[in-house]
Design a protein with these regions (language model features):
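Positively charged n-region of N-terminal signal peptides that target proteins for export
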Residues: 1-4, 93
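Sec/Tat signal peptide C-region and signal peptidase I cleavage site
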Residues: 17-21
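Mature catalytic domains of secreted/periplasmic carbohydrate-active enzymes
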Residues: 22-434
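Bacterial N-terminal signal peptides
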Residues: 6-16
């Protein structure tokens, strides 16, 4: 994922458009159906895992410590995650109420977590583990009914043909020469492997184009290939721009759609399916020293706020080098899953509600039901703007209690019952007249 860049570089990224052919993209019917499924799913598990986990300092450790590529390669023989259990990971996602998983097939270090035939810089050929974790996860997701997306970094700190260098990767010791077109051929080769050898994928989550914003990334060629290989697979890119033709969803890193607290997300919110990608602590890859864990209430609030903005939440864990997911992450996921088992009706299958986000919370909607998510409000009376249709009834989702309300031409005023102790989100269900 992306770390803050110097201001001058960030401005250059924002002001320069990549040279990409603007082709006419008509999504297939299967793709449109997959988009609707994606919007219904609402919650996914993001996994950042690779040889960098050995250094216990996040996924950017190669860049942050200025590690040369030749030195970094010595990590691979030490990477032997014998405690990795694909069934356990997928079951954990299920228990959390997640409907899909997105895992790093290749991060910025260039190391493939699958058995690539176009490179030997991968988990099967360079590590004593010698197993294809992407294949194992793909098979287990099919068994347990989740969809698998693959994260793929366009940026590469290891490949010699990733040249000219971009904003990062200058201390890796690679020769100051290379053929970027040849690198893109290599990238397309690996993507073809993923899209032809691992069954039906949910889609691909690109990252790293921001490293060389002025480059011609041959998006049309790559996107056409992917859509031809798997028409239903969704293509998205974390480039922090307005979506390009061929992209099927728009993501926001460490922010809700329309916000830019992290400094990355300057693009307007599109009409494509949306996704917020966020961490449980402050790191994407495993970081032993990062103990700044979000509480269950914070994660639930993030999920609810995303849903109220018509977006999914892709919540990240960074597994340990052993293949285990640390206890703090597992605990948090189980807590969120318990909340969703009680309140999932107001999340799954919904879209952003008729009321724009407010300081007190958000609304979601499913057919004739509007779910009022009261996250932060002390007054027993809550005034809502006028709704598209008359309100027939108002009840508390948790226990079915009736909620008194008054409706006028100007709006609806709810009289909220006392909140239960520790209640993160008081959800009032409004039944609208048909």
């Amino acid at each position: 994922m992306l770390r803050p860049l110097p201001i001058a570089l960030t401005l250059a990224t924002l002001m320069t458009a990549p040279a990409a052919a603007q082709y006419r993209y008509e999504p297939a019917p299967a793709n449109l159906a997959a988009r609707a499924w994606f919007q219904d799913a609402k919650f996914g598990l993001f996994i950042h895992w690779g040889v960098y986990s050995l250094l216990q300092d996040g996924e950017w450790v190669m860049q942050n410590r200025g590690i040369r590529a030749s030195e970094y390669e010595t990590l691979a023989p030490e990477f032997n995650p014998t405690r990795f259990d694909a069934a356990e990971w997928v079951a954990l996602a299920q228990a959390a109420g997640m409907r899909y998983i997105t895992i790093t097939s290749k991060h910025h270090d260039g190391f493939a977590m699958f058995d690539s035939q176009v490179s030997d810089w991968d988990i099967v050929e360079r590590t004593p583990y010698r197993r294809d974790v992407i294949r194992m996860l793909a098979e287990e997701c099919r068994r347990q009914g989740l969809r698998l997306f693959v994260y793929y970094s366009q940026l590469d700190w290891h490949h010699s043909d990733y040249f000219p260098r971009g904003q990062t990767g200058h201390a890796t010791g690679r020769a100051e020469s290379g053929d970027f077109g040849r690198y893109l051929d290599y990238m397309d080769g690996q993507l073809r492997e993923l899209f032809t050898g691992y069954g039906e994928l949910g889609g691909v989550w690109f990252d790293g184009m921001w490293d060389r914003p002025e480059a011609d990334w041959r998006l049309e060629r790559t996107y056409r290939m992917l859509h031809e290989l798997q028409p239903a697979a969704l293509v998205g890119s974390n480039h922090h721009r307005a979506p390009f033709p061929g992209e099927d969803f728009q993501m926001f890193e460490q922010d809700l759609p329309g916000a830019n607290t992290a400094g990355f997300n300057t693009a307007a919110v599109s009409d494509l399916p949306l996704e917020t990608a966020a961490t449980i602590n402050d790191s994407w890859g495993y970081h032993l020293g990062d103990r700044n864990f979000k509480s269950a209430a914070q994660v639930i609030g993030l999920l609810v706020n995303a849903a109220g903005r018509n977006a999914n939440l892709l919540l990240n864990v960074g597994p340990m080098p052993t293949g285990e997911i640390q206890p703090e992450f597992r605990t948090r996921l189980h807590e969120v899953g318990a909340w969703l088992r009680r309140n999932g009706e107001a999340i799954y299958g919904t879209r952003g509600g008729p009321i724009a986000p407010r300081p007190w919370g958000v609304t979601t909607q499913k057919q004739d039901r509007v779910y009022v998510h009261v996250l932060s409000w002390q007054d027993p009376r809550l005034a809502l703007p006028a709704l598209p249709r008359r309100v027939r009834a108002a009840t508390v989702l948790a226990d079915g209690r009736r909620v008194a309300f008054q409706e006028t031409a100007d709006g609806v005023t709810l009289t909220l019952p006392p909140r239960a102790e520790g209640e993160v989100d008081q959800i009032v269900v409004l039944e609208l007249a048909r």
